[in-house]
Amino acid sequence: MSYTNSPLVSYTCLSPYHSGERNHTIDTVTIHCVVGQCSVESLGTRFSDGSTKASSNYGIGYDGKIGMYVEEKNRSWCSSSSSNDNRAITIEVASDTVAPYKVSEKAMESLVNLLTDICRRNGIKNLLWKADKSLIGQVHEQNMTVHRWFAPTACPGEYLYSKHSDIAAEVNKRLSQEITEDSNVIYRVQCGAFKNRRFAENMVKQLKAQGYSDAFVVSVIK
């Protein structure tokens, strides 16, 4: 299977701490809290300098920037579960250092944007959340998991945990709004309107020089 990475990434710092190519298709997402209102750059340093020997596929800073630390084709070291991390895209989100580990509005918006992109590219039609640990791996029932199901940790914190249903609903709303093209409709593109015909003809020449051979001038009476 071929894998792609998110075009929403604005910072990349690939961590050496991963297991190489995953052994399962991507069908799950796991949201984590960093426990710190950090930047994507500082999180990248943490995942690269050996201080934690951990990683995630993506991270979101306090300011909403998105970083990539492990390419989607590879399994990150994030959830204390090999089976989970082989099938999940893992995302660390900057958060407060104390419970309930709240995240910023900018970080939350970027999280929803990133999840929508991940689902679209990997063929995940809907995010499903039932807060039920017994459904791990049953992705037709639930395809969101949390770190606390695999290790004695509070991650992702009560703030993000309580938002999982809302996050899934917003992502699913966006996924359902993809444009459906009507084969009986054509779309005309206008590049400009000029009072001077010479300017209009110059624009047509520029467009044709770029390969748009069907460009033409239309006169409109005001």
PLM regions: where:
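N-terminal catalytic cores of peptidoglycan-degrading enzymes
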Residues: 1-85, 155, 193
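Solvent-exposed beta-strand motifs enriched in subsets of small alpha/beta binding domains
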Residues: 179-222
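Short strand-loop junctions, especially beta-strand C-caps/beta-turns
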Residues: 34, 94-96, 190-194
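Structural preference for beta-strand elements that scaffold enzyme active sites
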Residues: 28, 88-90, 143-145
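Glycine-rich, often proline-containing surface loops adjacent to acidic residues and nearby aromatics
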Residues: 86-97
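Basic/polar, cationic surfaces and motifs that engage anionic cell-wall
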Residues: 2-12, 18-23, 97-183, 220-222
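Solvent-exposed, acidic/flexible segments
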Residues: 24, 51, 84, 100-108, ...
